[in-house]
Amino acid sequence: MASEPPSFPFQRASGMEPPAEFARLRATDPVSKVKLFDGSLAWLVTKYKDVTFVATDERLSKVRTRPGFPELNAGGKQAAKAKPTFVDMDAPDHMNQRGMVESLFTLEHVKKLQPYIQKTVDDLLAAMKKKGCANGPVDLVKEFALPVPSYIIYTILGVPFNDLDHLTNQNAIRTNGSSTAREASAANQELLDYLASLVEKRLEEPKDDLISKLCTEQVKPGNIEKADAVQIAFLLLVAGNATMVNMIALGVVTLFQHPEQLAQLKANPSLAPQFVEELCRYHTASALAIKRTAKVDLEIGGKHIKANEGIIASNQSANRDADIFENPDEFNMNRKWPAEDPLGYGFGPHRCIAEHLAKAELTTVFATLFKEFPDLNIAVPFEKINFTPLGGDVGVVDLPVTF
């Protein structure tokens, strides 16, 4: 008799290690069934070639209300009923809505933002320096990793500077895992209400920001409703924020685990881009986002998938696929990259819209942090670092440092 499919999501093996099941499945059963929280079954895809196939094949749907779409928890099942944004649409709706904001996330536009990104990083480090650590270690997550991406995305959206701290705090309550469900839900609602009032203001008095662009180019001509503009702004605000906070903190921890690479980066900050590239492969901070349901019967990796069966493609597992990446479980910022892209930001038409922005922020952070704080040190032993719960995306809840 066939054994019962394992429950998914898998638990990470430890604080920063991906689930051990992935390596076993890549070797023995790369496309296999897993059991979800509600008892339903879905296909789990673990090899690079199959994951990229899932991310690009138009016979698979991203629409969460379709039969068989795999939700990973009760919250996801509830969220699936809400009005979708472009991340949960198929072509042509997906590109129509994504195209409304994509110009603000192109490489060219991000290059124009670079002085502002650098100033944000510099200002936050200066504030940290001023505060000092004479009274004990400082939490690098609270003082730096959280505000860097928060301030930048809020500014792109058009949030006035005076509101940044309060909204950053609300977003932290929403995502940090230590809040109660009620607190997280209240913070969520507060952010939505705030963005709704900002949409109203920008309809009256547009400025040079993303919400004004949506109001002027899309809401006023009747292409989308006001509520859609709020949802798109909310998506851009929350989708990448927790992952960015985690990547900054994980990057610092990873460097201290690899002192020879830390020494290299300190001596030559221009190595930051290749460090960031490896960081995004090694720690897949958004590891559970490539989910689909089959519109028709098809084959993936030699398995027959029926219409209306759910599929979860693990970019986290694909990023450790030895057929693509040499010594994949080794962190090596000097690695020789294959022709294939690492999948930290997904793949295909739904690839993360803010990838260029995220990489610019991370590169600026890691080119600057150790220049300003050459004596930065983690103030607790590695085994005492407070990682995010093992059942979700990899991250660091708080990181006490001295400098």
Swiss-Prot record:
Enzyme Commission number: 1.14.-.-
Needed cofactors: heme
GO MF, any single term: heme binding
Record key words, sorted: Heme, Iron, Metal-binding, Monooxygenase, Oxidoreductase
Gene3D superfamilies on file: Cytochrome P450
Binding residue positions for heme: 352
Pfam family, one: p450
InterPro entries, sorted: Cyt_P450, Cyt_P450_B, Cyt_P450_sf
Enzyme kind, highest EC tier: oxidoreductase
Recorded family membership: Belongs to the cytochrome P450 family.
The name this protein goes by in its record: Cytochrome P450 55A2
Species name: Fusarium lichenicola (Cylindrocarpon lichenicola)
